Amino acid sequence: MKKLFFAIAFGFFFCGAFCFAEERAVKISVGDVELEGVIFDTALAEEIAAKFPLSVSMVGFGGREYYGAIPFTPKNADGGQLRFDDGDITYCATNNTLAIFYAQTDRPNLTMRVIPIGRVTSDLAAFKKFGAREKITFSFEK
């Protein structure tokens, strides 16, 4: 019994809030199209989500993503990765932008580090129909 208690306590201590983190549902509006997604329970994601509703003028790039500058600079932007998964919503500290990645390409490696803050859970095919520049709004359902 002591071993079981120790194993549970040990797991909780090292797992912490990360293992039990909850995602928050987010609405992503592109013109008349409404998509669903989630925002992760991280310091950076929550810092950005505190600014919702947030409209970002985004540009399509490389047949794989939309990205655009945000009007504030988050403080919790440490780390990052040079790859993405389809559906990732990311923040890039290098150029202070949000991005939505929707399609792997023949060049899946990135030149700037991005930090995932959420993901689109709707069908990503919608992004292939959008124009070269779109106003994308992130908000929470009321």
Region roles according to the model:
Residues 51-96:
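Mature extracytoplasmic domains of secretory-pathway proteins
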Residues 27, 112-142:
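Well-ordered alpha/beta subsegment
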Residues 23-69:
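N-terminal secretory signal peptides
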Residues 24, 33, 96-98, 132-134:
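Envelope-exposed proteins and targeting segments
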Residues 7-16:
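Bacterial N-terminal signal peptides
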Residues 19-21:
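Boundary at the C-terminal end of the N-terminal hydrophobic targeting segment
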Residues 93-120:
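Beta-strand-rich cores of mature extracytoplasmic or soluble domains
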Residues 1-4:
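Positively charged n-region of N-terminal signal peptides that target proteins for export
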